[in-house]
Amino acid sequence: MTPTHFTISSAFLLGMMGLAFHRTHLLSALLCLEAMMLALFIALSLWSLQLDATGCSTAPMLMLAFSACEASAGLALLVATARTHGTDHMQALNLLQC
């Protein structure tokens, strides 16, 4: 395993572990999701550069656009949750408590 592959895999796994273990605030979950998407974006960009294929060069930009849409939807949910519940704790999002 090359150092580049190790770094990208480590970044993705750290984001996944953060998402699994630190689920108290919605903002921290969104940041962990963004870290995972950034690791995937870098991996896909390096993969398309390694192959020298022009057809694969649009995939990282498409994934970056989807990541930006995911971030904006997540922040909109964060604002809506903070306005209705007064907090961004994940326990406030339980449907049985609403």
From Swiss-Prot:
Q: State the InterPro entries in the record.
A: NADH_UbQ_OxRdtase_chain4L/K (IPR001133), NUOK/Mnh_C1-like (IPR039428)
Which domain of life does the UniProt lineage start with? Answer: Eukaryota
List the GO cellular component terms: mitochondrial membrane; respiratory chain complex I
What range does the record give for the signal peptide? none
List the Gene Ontology MF annotations in alphabetical order: NADH dehydrogenase (ubiquinone) activity
The enzyme's E.C. designation: 7.1.1.2
The chemistry this enzyme catalyses reads: a ubiquinone + NADH + 5 H(+)(in) = a ubiquinol + NAD(+) + 4 H(+)(out)
Q: Where are the transmembrane segments?
A: 1-21, 26-46, 59-79
Q: Which Pfam families match?
A: Oxidored_q2 (PF00420)
Topology relative to the lipid bilayer, per the entry, is: Multi-pass membrane protein
This protein's record includes keyword Nucleotide-binding: no
UniProt GO BP: ATP synthesis coupled electron transport
PANTHER family, per the entry: NADH-UBIQUINONE OXIDOREDUCTASE CHAIN 4L (PTHR11434:SF0), NADH-UBIQUINONE OXIDOREDUCTASE SUBUNIT ND4L (PTHR11434)
The record's family statement is:
Belongs to the complex I subunit 4L family.
What is the protein's given name?
NADH-ubiquinone oxidoreductase chain 4L
Species whose genome carries this gene: Gadus morhua
Task: Recall the taxonomic lineage recorded for the source organism.
Answer: Eukaryota, Metazoa, Chordata, Craniata, Vertebrata
